[in-house]
Amino acid sequence: MKNRTLRQITAAGVIAAAYAAISLVLAPITFGAVQCRVSEALTLLPVLSPAAVWGVTLGCAITNGVGAATGANFLGLIDLLVGTAATLLAAITSRLLGKIRFGGVPWLSVLPPILFNAVAIGAEWCYAATGSINVAFWAFAGQIALGPVSYTHLTLPT
């Protein structure tokens, strides 16, 4: 039992470190109203391991925290809370949907990272830009969804 727990903690730590490292190395495209957070591709790992749920969540929190502290993340501490919560919900939902397979592939598990991030981060940017959530939300959500759609497409089996 101890070895299994240690393995899961280690896996979560490695995933968190990878998420943060990828995000921060690619900071110019990680933060912004139009972003491609390549590390969000790791939100598909919870399909394989429950440790990945905590790994991607911690990695996102580290990334958003460092981004807020350095000024790279314009949304600051709000994104630390909202963005990390969106990643946590996406990871949990991807894990749950990973059990539903078509042709042996968990196709539905790719949707939560796209949808949760588009809604949460799109709402953050809409509010930051306009002072309210209004029709501009759809433009921001669409821009945010483009990043996850691009990397999700690359991670799917052909």
Report the location of each language-model feature.
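Hydrophobic transmembrane alpha-helices
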Residues: K2-W54
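Short helix-perturbing small/polar motifs within transmembrane alpha-helices
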Residues: R4-A16, A20-A21, F74-G131
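Membrane-interface helix caps and helix-loop-helix hairpins in membrane proteins
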Residues: A27-I29, A72-L77
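Interfacial segments of multi-pass membrane proteins
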Residues: S49, I62-G67
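Central hydrophobic cores of alpha-helical transmembrane segments
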Residues: V53-T63, S109-I114
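Membrane-interface helix termini and inter-helical loops of multi-pass transporters
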Residues: T130-W138
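Individual transmembrane alpha-helices with interfacial aromatic-anchor signatures
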Residues: F137-S150
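Conserved small/polar residues in nucleotide/adenosyl-binding loops
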Residues: T152-P157
